[in-house]
Amino acid sequence: MAKLKITLVKSLIGRKKEHIATANALGLRKIRATVEHEGTPQIKGMLKKIDYLLKVEEI
């Protein structure tokens, strides 16, 4: 599986609680925070849920 570099590019203020919880579960708490995860189906599902807040790159 490919490694994914995930960056939070929009604020979590005013978002649905579920979307904030998803971002926090990915390890994203501040704007421009970046994490790396494996491209598992679980991670891809989380990314799809909040894709409007993120920038995702394959490494």
UniProtKB/Swiss-Prot annotation:
Annotated TM spans: none
Sorted UniProt keywords: Ribonucleoprotein, Ribosomal protein
Keyword Glycoprotein assigned: no
GO cellular component, one term: cytosolic large ribosomal subunit
A GO term, aspect molecular function: structural constituent of ribosome
SUPFAM superfamilies noted in UniProt: Ribosomal protein L30p/L7e
Any GO BP: translation
Record bears the keyword Metal-binding: no
InterPro entries for the chain: Ribo_uL30_ferredoxin-like_sf, Ribosomal_uL30_bac-type, Ribosomal_uL30_ferredoxin-like
NCBIfam families: rpmD_bact
Family: Belongs to the universal ribosomal protein uL30 family.
Entries under HAMAP family matching the protein: Ribosomal_uL30_B (MF_01371_B)
PANTHER family, per the entry: LARGE RIBOSOMAL SUBUNIT PROTEIN UL30M, MITOCHONDRIAL RIBOSOMAL PROTEIN L30
Subunit structure: Part of the 50S ribosomal subunit.
Protein name: Large ribosomal subunit protein uL30
Protein species of origin: Clostridium botulinum (strain Eklund 17B / Type B)
